[in-house]
Structure formats: C-alpha cells, structure tokens
Amino acid sequence: MLFDYEQELTIHRKDATQKTAATNAETYKNIDWEQVKVEQNLADYQALVRVPFPLISKKNQLYPVWDLRKYAFLFEQSTPATVHPKLWEQGKLNVQAGLYQVTENIFQVRGFDMANITFVKGKTGWIVIDCLTSKETAEEALKLVNQHCGKHSIKAVIFSHSHIDHYGGILGILPDSTQNKNSKVYAPAGFMDAVIDENVTAATAMTRRSQYMYGIRLRRDEKGLIDNGIGKEISFGTITLIKGNRRNSPFPTSFLCK
C-alpha cells in the first residue's frame, strides 16, 4: 500500500507532484532577487578570462574528461516545477568558468572541475594550491594561467587535504620527474595514510557512495542532475598522485577534513 505522499519507484521519470510544484512555486515568489543579483555579480567578480561551457578531452577516450555544455539547459528555460528555485539559481552560478584574480598576485581557475585551483605568484614562480581531480583538467588550468599571466616555473604545490579533487591533477602541474625533484610539495601530516584509507581500504564503499552523492548516473536536465552545491561534478580523467616532500601541518589529515 502506498500513502498519498508516496509514489511507486519505476524506471520512468516523473513530473513534479502537485505538492512539490506548489511548494516550489511559493518559494519562487518569495526569493530575494536582489540577493540573487548580488551573488551573480560576486560569481563574476574580477573575471580576467571567461571560458563559457569548457570542454576538456582526453586522447583515446570516447567521452570528455569535462564538459559543462551539458548544463546549458539551465539558461535555456525558466525554473521548472521539478527543481527548487534556489537550486536552479545555484546551478547557474556554478557554470561560471575561467580565470579570476582573487587579489594581487593570487589567481584562480574556476569551473574546470569540482574544486578550484589557486595560483599564487611568488618571487621565483608559481605556488599552486590544490590540483583538481584529473591530470587533464589541471593541465588546461595551468595553460590558461600561463597564457594570460605569463609562464613561470612551479616552485611549490600545496595539498590542502586528502580528497581526490584536491590532489588528483598533480601530474598536470608537475608532469616530469625533474620538476618533481625541483618543486616542493606540501601535504598535511598523515596525508598518504588518509589517501590510502579512502581510496584503497574503503574504495568499494566510497565509490558506491560517490555515485549517490554526486548523482553520476543521472541525466543533466530538469529531472536529473542540476548541481552539487560546491560545484557541478567531478571530472573523468587521469587521477594522479605523488608523495609530498614537505609537511605543512602538525594535525592529522582526518582532523583537517572535518
């Protein structure tokens, strides 16, 4: 027996229920659109180079590593009854992609992966904070920065913590062994242990959980995946890792990630 608030789960995607449609319509009427405008302006603030719907591919891979064109539908229709209006607006904000200047000598590439990658221009070269998920997305981010800020050597890389979208693109930033030796790689205490725990010991469970968490199997449309809150999704390229040769915190990684 199904109660009136339940629907039978089938393979067929459904329209919004009357209750959901009414709730979303009421929410839409009460949105502070001035605040939405402020957030839109902040998302575009200090953009040096805008990259609309970036597409990043990998040689001999049928599907792209990264493709924000899938989210163009967010700008092609009004807010549907199936999606909470605030989520719809958040989905638009996270499509913003390109090179941004945070402040003097600090730059970010946004919208090339789930996380952002930060470049600090030091006296002798770049200090890179976090490296995205994939080698390919990190390579494109570095290329974009070098094209518009001048090419500089990578003097240091900082892994802020052990989640894969913050270190997986390291070989896109430091592609050869010579650079690896000449560049300092800072990681929190316990970093490698945390990476192994998450991606080896708990790999099967974490992979299954991530499919629910990120909505990987959902279509990108008004009845599927809209956004992940902090970004669109993780990239599907080459995940890489090198061991940090410097320690930047006395605290265990598990503490830093809480």
Predicted regions span which residues?
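Conserved beta-strand hairpin/beta-sheet module of binuclear metal-dependent hydrolase folds
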Residues: G91-H152
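Flexible loop/turn segments at secondary-structure boundaries
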Residues: A115-N116, K135-T137, I164-H166, D193-V195
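Active-site metal-binding motif and surrounding structural segment of the metallo-beta-lactamase
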Residues: T124-G125, E136-Y186
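Internal hydrophobic scaffold segments of catalytic domains
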Residues: Y5, H12, K19-T23, Y167-S210
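Active-site metal-binding loops of divalent metal-dependent hydrolases
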Residues: C131-L132, S162, G190
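Metallo-beta-lactamase
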Residues: Q101, G150, M192-K258
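N-terminal pre-domain segments of enzymes
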Residues: L2-G91, V95-Q96
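Extracellular/periplasmic catalytic domains that process cell-envelope and extracellular macromolecules
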Residues: Y100-V102, G111-F112, S177-N180, S254-F255
